[in-house]
């Protein structure tokens, strides 16, 4: 049996007639940039997130960059973020001209540790970027309290967490703004790149809208240095077809996560550490990520059995060569470094079959019986 990490083909076949219809509508309209589908998606995602504004942009990385610039973050500023996430989070800070300050994670959730955030605040700190990794929100009440005490901006990186909740609060409700990615692998994915900023701050939203179109307002009159980063109409049309299915897909992911946890506990006990949904959180399981001893050997074995897995992420950001000038050393952020050696994400997508999950777990158990 072959089990892919992600299979978008079944989803496409289910939605194909409607996707073809909206794409044809866009083609016939000849309105490809910031058209009606972009406006509709912005309104729908904002309402879904209980936000006043949605600002579509080219991708999730640009969403972070634009939000930072709109919030006034720039050269000389420090932005505190997690060392254990995708590069775009820190790359966007650096692109804004600011200095990323990396802190360690909570080993249970893989998310940023608020106590470490508090300790990292200096007079140069301008913002905090918590990342809601794998689909579970960070401890936003604690982070929001730190931000309030120190007068800081909070930009939530929710690339993996659309639909997640914290004590009933949506992504973005406890921060200054939040950013989404619509990369094809995301829970709500386009057939190309796409991103969005959501916020309840009217001034910030308007600045984001200006920055995404070369900093022009009105057209051809430029008061700030902006970028060309717009969510195109065809991607917005595709996302508008997918969006009504998002909650159902999330429930399927949560069901698959519960199945994995049950099967793994039955098969290998505490040999691997399964994901924990913290009380008060609603985890959307963009990834189902275990901690596995002999992780690399297990991954190689599963590959031989036709099972795809991924390591998110093999090298923490504070040890990335591009950030060597910041002076971080190995051992400085031990939980992030430990996670990078142990984390393994198993196949996860709404259409995943239970027999596929059973096969995955059987092979994990076989590995630990014979090779560990």
UniProtKB/Swiss-Prot annotation:
The modification N6-(pyridoxal phosphate)lysine is found at residue 186. It is found in: Cell membrane. Keywords: Cell membrane, DNA-binding, Membrane, Pyridoxal phosphate, Transcription, Transcription regulation, Two-component regulatory system. Residues 160-179 bind DNA. Residues 53-158 are annotated as: Hydrophobic. GO terms for biological process: phosphorelay signal transduction system; polysaccharide biosynthetic process. CDD domains: AHBA_syn (cd00616). The keyword Transmembrane helix does not apply. It is a peripheral membrane protein. SUPFAM superfamilies: PLP-dependent transferases. GO terms for molecular function: DNA binding; pyridoxal phosphate binding; transaminase activity. The keyword S-adenosyl-L-methionine does not apply. GO terms for cellular component: plasma membrane. It comes from the Bacteria. Belongs to the DegT/DnrJ/EryC1 family. This membrane protein may function as a sensor protein and may transfer the signal of environmental stimuli to the regulatory region of target genes to activate or repress transcription of the genes. This is Pleiotropic regulatory protein. The lineage of its organism: Bacteria, Bacillati, Bacillota, Bacilli, Bacillales.
């Amino acid at each position: 049996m072959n089990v892919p990490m992600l299979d978008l083909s079944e989803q496409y076949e289910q939605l194909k007639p409607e996707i073809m219809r909206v794409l044809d509508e866009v083609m016939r309209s000849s309105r490809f940039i910031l058209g009606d589908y972009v406006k509709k998606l912005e309104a729908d995602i904002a309402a879904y997130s209980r936000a006043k504004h949605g600002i579509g942009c080219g991708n999730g990385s640009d969403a972070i960059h634009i939000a930072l610039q709109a919030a006034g973050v720039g050269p000389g500023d420090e932005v505190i973020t997690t060392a254990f996430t995708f590069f775009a989070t820190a790359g966007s800070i650096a692109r804004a001209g600011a200095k990323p300050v990396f802190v360690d994670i909570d080993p249970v959730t893989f998310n940023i540790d608020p106590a470490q955030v508090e300790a990292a605040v200096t007079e140069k700190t301008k913002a905090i970027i918590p990342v809601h990794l794998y689909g579970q929100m960070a401890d936003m009440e604690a982070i929001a309290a730190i931000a309030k005490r120190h007068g800081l901006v909070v930009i939530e990186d929710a690339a993996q967490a659309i639909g997640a909740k914290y004590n009933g609060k949506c992504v973005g409700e406890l921060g200054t703004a939040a950013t989404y990615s619509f990369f094809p692998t995301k829970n709500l994915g386009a057939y190309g790149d796409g991103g969005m900023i959501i916020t309840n701050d009217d001034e910030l939203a308007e600045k984001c809208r200006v920055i995404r179109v070369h900093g022009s307002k009105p057209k051809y009159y430029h008061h700030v240095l902006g970028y060309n980063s717009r969510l195109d109409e065809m991607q917005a049309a595709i996302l508008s077809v997918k969006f009504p299915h998002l909650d159902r897909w999330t429930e399927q992911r949560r069901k698959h996560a519960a199945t994995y946890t049950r099967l793994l506990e039955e098969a290998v006990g505490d040999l691997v550490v399964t994901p924990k949904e913290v009380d008060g959180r609603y985890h959307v399981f963009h990834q189902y990520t275990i901690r596995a001893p002999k992780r690399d050997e297990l991954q190689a074995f599963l590959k031989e059995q036709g099972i795809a897995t991924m390591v998110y992420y093999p090298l923490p950001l504070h040890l990335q060569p591009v950030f060597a000038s910041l002076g971080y050393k190995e051992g400085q952020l031990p939980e992030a470094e430990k996670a990078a050696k142990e984390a393994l994400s198993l196949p996860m997508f709404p259409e995943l079959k239970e027999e596929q999950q059973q096969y995955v777990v059987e092979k994990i158990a076989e590995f630990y019986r014979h090779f560990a």
